[in-house]
Structure formats: C-alpha cells, structure tokens
A protein has these predicted regions:
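ABC ATP-binding cassette signature C-motif
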Residues: 1-254, 304-475
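Leucine-rich amphipathic alpha-helices with coiled-coil/heptad-repeat character
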Residues: 101, 108, 124, 131, ...
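Intracellular alpha-helical coupling/juxtamembrane segments of multi-pass membrane proteins
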Residues: 241-284, 288-295
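A short, polar/charged loop/turn motif at coil->beta-strand junctions and beta-hairpin connectors
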Residues: 261, 296-300, 311-313
Length: 475
C-alpha cells in the first residue's frame, strides 16, 4: 500500500495553475527526485505532501501512523540557541511524553494515571524515545556538529546540517528535503548521498544537482505546468526517456497540425460542409482545434548575457602575506595575484572561511596583517550567498531598474519588462513584489540585476543554489 496518495490535486497562485488536477503516490523505500523549472510549484507541492500547506481542491491520503519530517530550503533558527537545543526540537513530542511519564511516576497513583503510564510507555518504545538524548548526540557526531555552539555563529552549510539532524532524530518514515545540498561542501554532499541511500524510509527531495540526483534517486518526478510525470530510475535515465518523449510528441504534433491545416482548407470551401453527412467531419475539426489550443508548447529558454564594464587593469587583486582571524585563524599568510581573465574557484569545507576570503579580496573587510589591494578600473558585480541585497517589498521592475522603465545592456536600451522576460519573468509578473517569488526565482532575479550592471569582475558566492537545471547549464 502507498504511504501517500495525491489525487486530482489543484493549486493556483494568482492566475497560474501550479497543480492542475494531477496525481502522485509514494511507496515504501522510494527516493523520488522532484524536478522542474523555478516557480513551477515544487516547494509548494513538497509542503502539501508534508502536511504543511493545503490544496485548493483534490485529496491527500496518508498511511495510518505515518511519521514525516521536512527540511526547508532555508531553515530558520533562533541564532542564540545551541545546536543541541535546535536539533532536540526534532524529538519535541518524545521529550514531552518522557517529561509527562516522569511527572506521573512520582505523582499519586490511581487507575487513570496507571493507564496513562502504560500508554506513554508503549508510545515511547515505538518511537525509541527512552534514549532521545543519546540519539541526538550520535546524530550530531555523525554530522560533525558541536552541540554547545550557538546557531548564529555557524556557516550556511552547517546550519543546513543542523536542519538535517533535526529531521533525522525524529526517525521519520518519510523525509522531505527542499534543496538539501545548498550550502553543503563537497564532502558533505557525498556524506548526504550515502546517508540517504542507507535511510530505511522514503525520501522526496527537490534538487537541481544532477550528480546528486543520479546518486540518490530511484525515480524522477517532473512538475511541468501543473502536471506531474514519473520516470523510473535516476536523472540519466530520465534524460534518455525525456528525449524520446519529446521526439514522439513533436512528431505527433506535426501530424496533427498537418491534418488541422487540411481540414481548415476544407471548411473554408463551405459548400461540402453544409451537407448532413459532413457533421462528423465538422465535429472532428472542432476537436482538433480544441487539442491545438490546449497544447502545452515548450517553455522558453532563459537568455543570459553580462553587461561588460570598462576593461580593467591587468591585475585585478593582489594579496601579500594576508592573515585574518576571528575566534580562530581563517586565512594565514596568504599571497596571491588574480589577473584579468582568470576564473578562480574557491573550495573548502563548510565554515573554513571561503566567504571571508572573498571579502578580503574585494576589500570589504580588512586583513589583520598583510596587504590586500584591488587593481585599477575594477567594476565588481557581487552575488552573495545569503542574498542580503534582496528588497522583498520592491516590485520586480523596480528592483531591476529603480525609477526607470529602461535599462542599458552593452550600450543598447532595453525595456525592463523585455529584459525580465529574458529571465523568464512574464510581463504580467513585472509589478509583483519580490516576496511572491520562489527561492530559485529570487536567485534568477538577482542574476538579472547583477548582469544588468556594467562589470568586469564577477564574484559569485554559491551562485548555483536553487537554480533550475536549464539555468545552471546556461550559467
């Protein structure tokens, strides 16, 4: 029996159908990779499956007693609480039961309290609740997290680990993960792959990391303009099946278009069409017109181009014996020169100080010792990991070009609505607030703004987070 069944699901956001009467089911031990363009409704669907949001219409059924855990795209924690306290929230129900058991154990006994103690005992045993502290500590140890450190001092990757730990300690039957690899370093992603493959429950995850999908998924489910389609196997298998499907669909559409054109010529002749025996043919023509009108044409492609600034000097940045420490050394005696035309990748584990090093190179923070010098005629476009530059109350149009309907790209004027359309934001959405966008759409908007500014140095801190597969390939 399926763990979760979604039937005739409908969900709309404004004039856009995110779910258009679609179906979905999840079986035991399945690991489903949910894919689709940014803004198609993947995160909304995941929240609906996890019981956090409601459908407009349709039904959602769960197997009785099903335990679920959900990890958000950008987990929110109290920055002053410790890692141990945050992860313990994953066993809040177990903690409450054990506290009640301990209170009843020392209270005056009667038939009701005795019956309640038996109930709690069986619940705790079924949820492995007697040793929840040990489970939390073991999980933190596996994820290399210090239980006593404050959340606010953690990097983006380590905060994601805390959210994963919080979900895992709940021992769920189904794990829902929204962009689980965001902010994780390469070793952490490999570790997460192994963890999910060994996980005994079912997994539904959203990610645009193709290698991760290949390693983890047993099935790919694509959300495309309100409809869910399932493909067995991993992402590589999906690509092969999808290519065949697109080719078959194109052939069928071409045949239908040819037949429709022939029938339109016939109906315009008029005389034959008035005969009684032609009624069936007229009905077929109407049906062909309906099918053509309802056809879901291929989605547009994003157009990425960078507005080039003035040519920079030969040296972009020069670092000489640079050191920087906070509670520990981050950068120690580092010397490097970055030249015009270089493409530099910064690698390192979560919390190692990659973002700090970026800021040292850019001059937004000063080294404790040594010198960091920017070259001449440098125009920097900076894409930051925490997306601090987003004004959620601004409209898309105002965010891209404040106070003007026009922007200049490589010396040519372009209307801001047309420019937004290059990044797959329809003209109708140009006046929507930024707050209505999904995580991936917000990143696409940031890229649109970034590329609209003349620049000769691009600085990208985790640029691929939340972006869909098509956009990633173009980037």
């Amino acid at each position: 029996m399926a763990l979760i069944v979604l039937n005739d699901a409908k969900l709309a956001f404004g004039h856009v159908d995110l779910l258009a009467g679609t179906q979905f089911s999840l079986e035991s031990s399945e690991r489903i990779g949910l894919i689709g363009r940014n803004g198609t409704g993947k995160s909304s669907l995941l929240k609906i499956l996890a019981g956090l949001e409601k459908l407009d219409d349709g039904s959602l059924q769960y197997q009785q007693g099903l335990r679920m855990a959900y990890v958000a795209q950008e987990p929110i924690f109290d920055p002053v609480e410790t890692v141990f306290h945050a992860v313990s929230q994953g066993v809040a129900e177990v903690k409450a039961l054990r506290e009640e058991y301990e209170e009843l154990s020392v209270a005056e006994w009667n038939d009701d309290s005795h019956h309640r103690l038996d109930e709690i005992q069986s619940q705790l045993e079924s949820m492995s609740g007697w040793n929840w502290e040990q489970r939390v500590h073991e999980t933190l140890d596996r994820l290399h997290l210090d239980p006593d450190i404050a959340i606010g001092s953690l990097s983006g990757g380590n905060r994601k680990r805390v959210a994963l730990a919080q979900a895992l300690v709940a021992v769920p039957d189904v794990l829902f993960l929204d962009e689980p690899t965001n902010h994780l370093d390469l070793d952490s992603i490999t570790w997460l792959e192994e963890l999910l493959k060994a996980f005994k429950g079912s997994v539904v995850l959203i990610t645009h990391d193709r290698a991760f999908l290949d390693a983890v998924s047993t099935q790919i489910v694509e959300l495309d303009r309100g409809i869910l389609r399932s493909y067995p196997g991993n992402f590589t298998a999906y690509e092969a099946l999808k290519e065949q499907e697109i080719a078959s669909e194109a052939l069928a559409n071409a045949r239908a278009d040819k037949l429709l054109a022939q029938e339109e010529v016939w109906i315009r002749k008029g005389v034959e069409a008035r005969r009684t025996r032609s009624v069936g043919r007229i009905a077929r023509l109407e049906k062909l017109r309906e099918i053509r009108a309802a056809r879901r044409d291929a989605m547009g492609q994003i157009k990425l181009s960078v507005a080039s600034g003035n040519r920079s000097g030969k040296i972009v940045a020069d670092l000489e014996s640079v050191s920087k420490s906070y509670d520990r050394p981050i950068v120690k005696d580092f010397t490097a020169t970055i030249l015009r035309g270089d493409k530099v990748g910064l690698l390192g584990p979560n919390g190692a100080g990659k973002t700090t090093l970026l800021k040292l190179i850019l001059g937004s923070i000063q080294p404790d010792s040594g010198t960091a010098t920017m070259g001449s005629q440098i125009d920097v476009a900076y894409f930051d990991q925490m997306r601090e530059g987003l004004d959620l109350n601004a409209t898309l149009e105002d965010y891209i070009s404040p106070g003007s309907e026009w922007i200049e790209i490589n010396g040519a004027r372009k209307h801001v609505k047309s420019y937004l359309n290059d990044f797959l934001f329809s003209p109708e959405r140009a006046n929507s607030p930024v707050s209505t966008l999904s995580g991936g759409e917000r990143n696409r908007l940031l890229l649109a703004r970034l590329f609209a500014r003349p620049a000769n140095v691009l600085v990208l801190d985790e640029p691929t987070n939340d972006l869909d597969i098509d956009t990633l390939e173009l980037l």
